[in-house]
């Protein structure tokens, strides 16, 4: 089955080759039909983000998801480079 979640995963793996990629479907916490794929939380760790601003990281992720972004109602993005993630890994 080609779910939105699996497409997000495929596109981000291809574009960023992350060392950590956690995609959490949070749709169940919202007033949507059972099994909906509309709200996601994303934690992505890649050295591609080293010395890149948060805004540019978000833009790069949205660009990678360009083909499916209209299918997603909400996307919470937490992008890190390796060093940042090591400092914050207790929280993610």
Which residues does each PLM region occupy?
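Short edge beta-strands and adjacent turn/loop segments
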Residues: 21-40
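Short, glycine/charged-enriched secondary-structure capping and boundary segments
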Residues: 36-39, 57-58, 92
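Short, non-transmembrane amphipathic alpha-helical segments
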Residues: 8-12, 55-67
């Amino acid at each position: 089955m080609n779910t939105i979640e699996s497409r997000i995963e495929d596109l981000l793996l291809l574009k960023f080759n992350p060392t950590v990629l956690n995609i959490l479907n949070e749709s169940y916490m919202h007033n949507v039909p059972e099994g909906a794929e509309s709200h996601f939380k994303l934690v992505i760790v890649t050295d591609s983000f080293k010395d890149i601003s948060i805004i540019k990281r978000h833009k790069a992720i949205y660009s990678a998801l360009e083909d499916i972004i209209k299918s997603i109602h909400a996307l919470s993005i937490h992008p890190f480079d390796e060093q940042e993630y090591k400092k914050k890994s207790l929280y993610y």
